[in-house]
Amino acid sequence: MTKYIKLTLNLSAFLIVALLGFTLVSLVTHNKLDRLTASNANIVGTMSEYKAAVKDKERRMQCMTQNIYWEAASEPAEGKLAVAQVVMNRAESGKFPADPCQVVYQKNIIYERVLCQFSWYCEQNFNTKPVHKKLWDESAEAARMVMVDGFRLPELKDALYYHADYVNPQWNKKQVAKIGRHIFYK
């Protein structure tokens, strides 16, 4: 009988240990699954945020490239970079919208007249496809250098305005540089 009791006790102990082990494994597994599920939720949230950020970056690159193309396509590389830098200077100045696209597309109404910050936008060129791929690619490269790489021309660090040299806007601003056919002011 004592052998039977010992066997029963050993079997009971084994079952208890096995049950505890199974419970612990189950708890650990569920805990890992819960963390994995939470982690996946974060990844999904992070992925959607990432996709939104990529889409926003592409939007900003597109409008900056358009602005450079329509404002300075025939300018030398330095002139294209200068136009992009003025947009970024404005966006970073606190005097204009903080988003480069909003800077590009900004309109003002003065004496009941709509004035665009950049003339090509008022001329409705935003719906016109660029015809010179090489100039478009150069404009895109200038946009990338200024917006992504942070390239800046030192002489334009404070420039917020510019105009073509064949226009006389009667501004009372300090000229800081002339690059290509554009004159830059702070």
Which ranges hold each PLM region?
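Bacterial extracytoplasmic/cell-wall-associated proteins, especially those involved in peptidoglycan
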Residues: 26, 30, 34-186
